[in-house]
């Protein structure tokens, strides 16, 4: 099964992703991990014929819209976004497939809207992150400093695709072909080469 690019208007934003040829098969909405994109599911899709598989770039990732200035990425917002995507697809009930952060969002979406989610498939699920209580104030200070410094932060520019491919291979223990899949969908052309197209706000330290 091959996946083709698509773009979907959702609640005033653009949701991009990859989709199999729509069939009468099981409807599956796939959610990728942190700083990944819909291409995460390309190798898996080859082993899943007969599904109506939609893999989206979550907000701020891949080719999807970034959140508006002055807003931040959070879990409740991600849950609402998943349901809005399903609404835009015309899917009343569907299966959720998630990897890492996407698996965490999928599991919480299933808990928040069990009447919509038929099945939940979680790969390397990532739960909520929690630090020591006595570090709360320090984490908040670090988050605020990072937010205020963000406008002056320069994008990292790669002269070619080889460097970001190597970076993904080292960071995630990926093969070269799998790392290249993610990189080709996860970078944008800029002056001097390429830069990550993911929203820099996704890299902010956790506030609480």
Q: Which residues does each PLM region occupy?
A:
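Active-site loop/oxyanion-hole signature of alpha/beta-hydrolase fold enzymes
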Residues: 11-13, 18, 54-97
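Conserved HGGG/HGGXW glycine-rich cap/lid loop of the alpha/beta-hydrolase fold
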Residues: 18-66
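Flexible "cap/lid" loop of the alpha/beta hydrolase fold
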Residues: 111, 118-157
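Alpha/beta-hydrolase fold catalytic core
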Residues: 1-28, 49-52, 91-92, 127
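Gly/Ala-rich beta-loop-alpha elbow adjacent to hydrolase catalytic centers
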Residues: 98-102, 106
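Conserved alpha/beta-hydrolase catalytic His-Asp/Glu region
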Residues: 152-207
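Aromatic pocket-lining residues of Rossmann-like dinucleotide-binding sites
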Residues: 48, 109-113
């Amino acid at each position: 099964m091959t996946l083709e690019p698509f773009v979907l208007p959702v609640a005033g934003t653009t949701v991009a992703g990859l989709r199999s040829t729509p069939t009468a098969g099981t409807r599956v909405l796939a959610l990728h991990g942190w700083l990944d994109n819909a291409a995460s599911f390309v190798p898996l899709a080859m082993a899943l014929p007969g599904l109506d598989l939609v893999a989206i770039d979550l907000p701020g990732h891949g080719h999807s819209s970034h959140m508006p200035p002055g807003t931040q990425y959070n879990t409740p917002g991600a849950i609402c976004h998943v349901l809005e995507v399903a609404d835009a697809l015309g899917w009343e009930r569907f299966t959720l497939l998630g990897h890492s952060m996407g698996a965490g969002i999928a599991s919480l979406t299933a808990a928040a809207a069990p009447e919509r989610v038929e099945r939940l498939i979680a790969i390397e699920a990532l739960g909520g992150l929690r630090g020591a209580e006595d570090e709360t104030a320090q984490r908040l200070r670090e988050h605020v400093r990072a937010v205020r410094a963000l406008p002056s932060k320069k994008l990292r520019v790669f002269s070619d695709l080889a460097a970001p491919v190597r970076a993904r291979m080292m960071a995630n223990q990926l093969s070269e072909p799998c790392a290249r899949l993610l990189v080709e969908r996860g970078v944008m052309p800029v002056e001097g080469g390429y830069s990550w197209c993911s929203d820099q706000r996704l890299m902010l330290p956790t506030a609480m």
